[in-house]
Structure formats: structure tokens, C-alpha cells
Swiss-Prot record:
Protein name in the entry: Heterogeneous nuclear ribonucleoprotein K
Gene3D superfamilies: K Homology domain, type 1
The KH domain, residue ranges: 42-104, 144-209, 387-451
Residues carrying Phosphothreonine: T39
Lineage: Eukaryota, Metazoa, Chordata, Craniata, Vertebrata
Organism: Macaca fascicularis (Crab-eating macaque)
Length: 464
């Protein structure tokens, strides 16, 4: 639905020589990266936007979007949504799409830019946010920007190439940063390709990617992302939500961490809510092959994040971790980290080292939770060493001490550890929640240590 938005117009690129022309050496570089596109072929581009940026594209009374449709003879739409994200859809030939993007990019702004937390700093709050990056402040195209391209998951391999060769070539030839997120958008088969750099180069990169994927047929089921099913528990590279208490409305900003916290999107009048993540997992096309047998964990890939999460297999015939209702460990550890029956949760974990935390939370043999598969290659080469996955369980009453207000605490743990951390909702009738940690061995160990400290520091203080 196109609603009336504050007046905002596109820059006149015809009178702005800086934006319309590129140095000869740039053109030579592009020629070195040859493309064999049919310039008349119609393709569809879908860009993930912050909801607040829809007004810049639509314009007051739909003025801007109507001008784009008329001037470029293209199909341009920004469907409404109830969350912090919307999708800009453009259907035209590739060259025309590039020109439309050059019109749109200077009108956008990036969301709240939070200071990066450090190991010793407090968690940043919205009041600490610096000024939004508004691309309209710049003249010409000499500024850095980011766009999030949506592609079907089956097309990712064509962008990455053999051992990452294609994506490396793209980065070098277009002088952009490219990150292909591994996890699909919530309840969809779409993945996010985050492209950053100067506007002209970002647009050129997108044109090349469109050319690459236009030659490849989509394989498998196609379920385009619907932003109304926005869910921060998915680490897909979209935008997260922060509520502006002064206005009582959600404010979107880029996900700079590695995921989100457990929170389902608010319902929308008359619109059915998506099934729970666990239910949806059963029909996900990304389930991959069955997990390898114990002791033969895969290497080189990340476990299919949308796999149905099994109950933790008991190491050596016992429970992975036993708790009482106050969140204290019980007395069954089967040779792992031992505690006396009267030892409290706080006194126990006070003395844990990272290695002891890891021992207590990982099954003996080291691979019982390492359900890896080779299909997940997003973030190719971003991390050193094999990517593994570990699952731990905590009483659901303690989850708040890890998540924190607005999810800020878990975001900081992700940021500091570099690991992907997901906290599942408890199963029906269960008093526990499963935490899935994905990353290198060092990242997982750091994450476990930070989780330990968070529970120790906040469980009693906040009354969990």
C-alpha cells in the first residue's frame, strides 16, 4: 500500500556530473570483468530496506515511485509491512535497474548506529546512538553505502564459486565488500547478499550478480521472504528492531551482530502469524542430509540452522546437564565437571574456567552436537578453522539473564565472541530452552564463558 509520506525528492543526476560519469580507468576495470548480458532481458531485483526508508522511495502521495515507473518504464513497488523491514522490488532490464538504484541510493539512510561494545564497556542504549547516516547529506556519489540483495538459496553457489573464487573476483573487480549470509530469511528460501562500497560500485556489483543468477534456474521450492514474518531469532543479515520510547514506535537498524533474540513479531490485524520456527523447520528445504553418526562430525560447513533441533543426546548415558527449578545444577554429570549436592549454581560457576564450562556443556567425544554439512557456505572464508555447532540447555527462567532488555545482552555476547548464538523457545511442557552456538572452537569457547558470566551476574540481580 502506497501511503502518503513526507516530501522527499530524488537528486537530479542529469545535472550532477559527478554522479553520472566515471573515470576511464574504472570503465577499463569493468571491461576486465566481462559480462555477456542481454540488456533487453527483464529481470527482477529485490532489495531489503528499513521500513522508514520506504517513504524516500515512495515520496509524498506516491510522487517518487510514480516518476520511477514512468521515467524508466519499469515495475517498482514497496509493499507495506508491519515490521522494521520492507522489500523494494524492481522489474526491468539490468541496465535500467542500475539507473533506478542510482536514483534511490542517495535518498536512503542507515539506521541507528550504535557504538561498538567492548569487553569492558556497558551495553549501548538507544540514547547512545550517534546520528543516522543519511546519504542525502553527501553530494555526488563519493560516499559509502550498503544494499541488501535477496536471492533464492539455490543461486548462492553461483555467486560464491568454487572455493570462493567467484565472490573473491567480484570483490576485487568491483572494489566492494560482499557478505552472503548463510541463513535464509524467516520462513522463506531467500538469502541476503550484503554489498557495501561507493554507490556506483555497489550498483555495478549488483548488475553483475543479476547477470550471473539470471542464467541459472532456481532449484527446489521457492518461498519469497515476506517481511511481515520478520523474526530476529534468525541470523539472516536483515534489520533488527529497537523501540523508540519517546514515540512508541519501532525503529530499525542493521543487524551488526550475528543474529537476534527470541521474540516473535507482533500480530497484524487479520493476518495469520507464521508457524513457530520449530514447526516450520520440518518443512524447510534447507534441512540437508541427516546428521552424521556420533564421533564423525562433519567439517568445513555449518550445521543446517533450520534443522529441527533434537533433544540433547545424553553423554555416556546420562543427562547433559540437570537443574532444579531454581536454576542450580543437580548431581548427575557422568564424569564431566563435578559438584556436590548442596553446591549452588552461583558458587559452582564462580570457579569455572572456559575449558570447564566447555567440558560441562559439551558431550564427551566432542562431536555429538557437531551436525555439519557442506551446503552452508555463506560467510565463506570469514572465519578461521572448521565451523562447528554445540547445543546447551538452560532452565527457561534463566534465559532473561542471557538475553537482557531488548536483547542487548545476547547481542553483546555475539559481538564479543564472534559466534552465532540462538535461543529456542521451550518445547510445550518443557522447562528448558536450548541454546545453539555456532562458530570456530575458540568462538564457541568464548561464547560459553560469556554466557556463564551473564547468568552469574544477572540471574539473582534481575530476579530470574
Amino acid at each position: 500500500m502506497e501511503t502518503e509520506q513526507p516530501e522527499e525528492t530524488f537528486p537530479n543526476t542529469e545535472t550532477n556530473g559527478e554522479f553520472g560519469k566515471r573515470p576511464a580507468e574504472d570503465m577499463e576495470e569493468e571491461q576486465a570483468f566481462k559480462r555477456s548480458r542481454n540488456t533487453d532481458e527483464m529481470v527482477e531485483l529485490r532489495i531489503l530496506l528499513q521500513s522508514k526508508n520506504a517513504g524516500a522511495v515512495i515520496g509524498k502521495g506516491g510522487k517518487n515511485i510514480k516518476a520511477l515507473r514512468t521515467d524508466y518504464n519499469a515495475s517498482v513497488s514497496v509493499p507495506d509491512s508491519s515490521g522494521p523491514e520492507r522489500i523494494l522490488s524492481i522489474s526491468a532490464d539490468i541496465e535500467t535497474i542500475g539507473e533506478i538504484l542510482k536514483k534511490i541510493i542517495p535518498t536512503l539512510e542507515e539506521g541507528l548506529q550504535l557504538p561498538s561494545p567492548t569487553a569492558t564497556s556497558q551495553l549501548p542504549l538507544e540514547s547512545d546512538a550517534v546520528e543516522c547516516l543519511n546519504y542525502q547529506h553527501y553530494k555526488g556519489s563519493d560516499f559509502d553505502c550498503e544494499l541488501r540483495l535477496l536471492i533464492h538459496q539455490s543461486l548462492a553457489g553461483g555467486i560464491i564459486g568454487v572455493k570462493g573464487a567467484k565472490i573473491k573476483e567480484l570483490r576485487e573487480n568491483t572494489q566492494t565488500t560482499i557478505k552472503l549470509f548463510q541463513e535464509c530469511c524467516p520462513h522463506s528460501t531467500d538469502r541476503v547478499v550484503l554489498i557495501g562500497g561507493k554507490p556506483d560500485r555497489v550498483v555495478e556489483c549488483i548488475k553483475i550478480i543479476l547477470d550471473l543468477i539470471s542464467e541459472s534456474p532456481i532449484k527446489g521450492r521457492a518461498q519469497p521472504y515476506d517481511p511481515n514474518f520478520y523474526d530476529e531469532t534468525y541470523d539472516y543479515g536483515g534489520f533488527t528492531m529497537m523501540f523508540d520510547d519517546r514515540r512508541g514506535r519501532p525503529v530499525g537498524f542493521p543487524m551488526r551482530g550475528r543474529g537476534g533474540f527470541d521474540r516473535m513479531p507482533p500480530g497484524r490485524g487479520g493476518r495469520p502469524m507464521p508457524p513457530s520456527r520449530r514447526d516450520y523447520d520440518d518443512m524447510s528445504p534447507r534441512r540437508g542430509p541427516p546428521p552424521p553418526p556420533p564421533g564423525r562430525g562433519g567439517r568445513g560447513g555449518s550445521r543446517a540452522r533450520n534443522l529441527p533441533l533434537p533433544p540433547p543426546p545424553p553423554p555416556r548415558g546420562g543427562d547433559l546437564m540437570a537443574y532444579d527449578r531454581r536454576g542450580r545444577p543437580g548431581d548427575r554429570y557422568d564424569g564431566m565437571v563435578g559438584f556436590s549436592a548442596d553446591e549452588t549454581w552461583d558458587s559452582a560457576i564462580d570457579t569455572w574456567s572456559p575449558s570447564e564450562w566447555q567440558m560441562a556443556y559439551e558431550p564427551q567425544g566432542g562431536s555429538g552436537y557437531d551436525y555439519s554439512y557442506a551446503g552452508g557456505r555463506g560467510s565463506y572464508g570469514d572465519l578461521g578453522g572448521p565451523i562447528i555447532t554445540t547445543q546447551v540447555t538452560i532452565p527457561k527462567d534463566l534465559a532473561g539473564s542471557i538475553i537482557g532488555k531488548g536483547g542487548q545482552r545476547i547481542k553483546q555476547i555475539r559481538h564479543e565472541s564472534g559466534a552465532s548464538i540462538k535461543i529456542d523457545e521451550p518445547l510445550e511442557g518443557s522447562e528448558d530452552r536450548i541454546i545453539t552456538i555456532t562458530g570456530t572452537q575458540d568462538q564457541i569457547q568464548n561464547a560459553q564463558y560469556l554466557l556463564q558470566n551473564s547468568v552469574k551476574q544477572y540471574a539473582d540481580v534481575e530476579g530470574f
